[in-house]
């Protein structure tokens, strides 16, 4: 495993938890608008007819030839804030994504996340 430096290269790959349990498929990368660095990924989870995209922080993520490993358990990701597969993250929902993972959102009025 090595650090996940360019997550865009891993779109469509399997995402696993620290124990190696498959969570889903890497769908998109969201960057912090102040640094343009990856901040969250979305992972396609759920049943075939009811897929959704769950947000997961990239801090501590690593990659191997077959998967991206995140630092959160499968159950935590399954319960995380999510959007429809064709949806967009509303600006009003951003603070909730950060709060779910106990991350500081700050008090800035502009958006913190942008899909790349």
Model-derived regions: residue spans:
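Peripheral interaction segments used for macromolecular assembly
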Residues: 1-116
């Amino acid at each position: 495993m090595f650090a996940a430096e360019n997550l865009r290269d891993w779109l469509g790959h399997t995402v696993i938890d620290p124990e190696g349990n498959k969570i889903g498929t890497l769908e998109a990368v969201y960057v912090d608008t102040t640094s343009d660095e990856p901040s969250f990924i979305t992972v396609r989870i759920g049943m075939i007819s009811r897929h959704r995209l769950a947000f997961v922080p990239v801090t501590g993520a690593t990659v191997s030839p077959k998967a991206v490993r995140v630092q959160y358990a499968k159950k935590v990701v399954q319960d995380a804030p999510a959007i429809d597969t064709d949806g967009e993250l509303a600006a009003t929902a951003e603070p909730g994504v950060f709060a779910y993972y106990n991350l500081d959102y700050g008090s800035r009025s502009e958006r913190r996340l942008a899909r790349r």
